Amino acid sequence: MIKVNTSLKPADLQSKLERFWQLSGEKVRLIDAEYDLSKGTPVFTIDGKYTTRGWTEWTEGFLYGSAVLQFDATGDKEALAYGRDNTIRRMASHVSHIGVHDHGFNNLSTYGNLLRLQHEGRIEKDDWQSHFYELALKVSGAVQASRWTVIPEGGYIHSFNGPHSLF
């Protein structure tokens, strides 16, 4: 059973969060240095090393989005460059992909966070990048909206499997 400590404050977690972000930065760099992307996107680990499933690329947004969040939390400009450059170079195939349900994982983790950081003034605002990120999110949203399924009580967005599936 989980015990909720209602007296806990964010400041109480400072040292743990510092350690978390230190480890996160190490992992982002390690995956970049050691993982062979020609094998596909890393999905899970075997003996502590990432490997792929071969049939899905649903984690690619996390790969680069984690680097963007690393910058967001720590100011690590190297992580930002890695996340932004790879979003621009490698993530376009996910934007309009109708055969997956992973638009949030892939597109919000990358384009969405980069756009948010621009709006917050955390990274330089560049018009072409802003428009690029916005277009990616609009197209991704349109793909999701095309899955809208009407039911008597309203509706829902079905998965890539079809109206019978919320997966």
Q: What spans do the regions from the language model cover?
A:
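Glycan-recognition and catalytic cores of secretory/periplasmic carbohydrate-active enzymes
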Residues: 1-167
